[in-house]
Amino acid sequence: MKIDITDYNHADEILNPQLWKEIEETLLKMPLHVKASDQASKVGSLIFDPVGTNQYIKDELVPKHWKNNIPIPKRFDFLGTDIDFGKRDTLVEVQFSNYPFLLNNTVRSELFHKSNMDIDEEGMKVAIIITKGHMFPASNSSLYYEQAQNQLNSLAEYNVFDVPIRLVGLIEDFETDIDIVSTTYADKRYSRTITKRDTVKGKVIDTNTPNTRRRKRGTIVTY
């Protein structure tokens, strides 16, 4: 895949280059993970697969000594149960859920930062939040990168948060052959049990025209 990034509060100056390299390399070599939708308006069409994407990232980072599912201290557990990944002073959240969850990630990252909470035997200094681009068809109301940019830009304009954040968007080029991992689950919406998984070629078709006023998501096809 390809990535786009937006930094807040000088994250580019604070982020450890080696830790970022491990994240970047993982994302750049990752294939696009898809599954068939079961939502009424797009039954059977291919959409972004958050479960497969999360698992790929986990399988790549844990062997590099990134901690996974780091428990949130009890005094802060009103904001959730755990952090996706962490290493040294860096926190990573993979956010493909509904768009309001970005604010939760931001607030708790701010709290962890200001309280100097230990991530991996070091106080937390910077957060990386990974999202998907708007170009990918996805489950209704799930967060996308451009939306996250708008939210964080507005918050940053009024100095709502001080924690350094690197926002990452997963993207691809339209109309270009790419590697795709297509997965079928035991239950299309909630299951993590894989019944079939294929690695194929495919592309994301641009469904926009020069006259399109509001950018539409692409269509994913495999062959």
Swiss-Prot record:
Coiled coil: none
Cofactors (names): Mg(2+)
Subunit structure, interactors included: Homodimer.
Cofactor note: Binds 1 Mg(2+) ion per subunit.
Keyword Oxidoreductase: no
An example Gene Ontology molecular-function term: DNA binding
GO biological process per UniProt: DNA restriction-modification system
Positions of Mg(2+) binding: 84, 94
Catalytic activity: Endonucleolytic cleavage of DNA to give specific double-stranded fragments with terminal 5'-phosphates
Protein's recorded name: Type II restriction enzyme BglII
Entry's EC annotation: 3.1.21.4
Keywords annotated in UniProt: Endonuclease, Hydrolase, Magnesium, Metal-binding, Nuclease, Restriction system
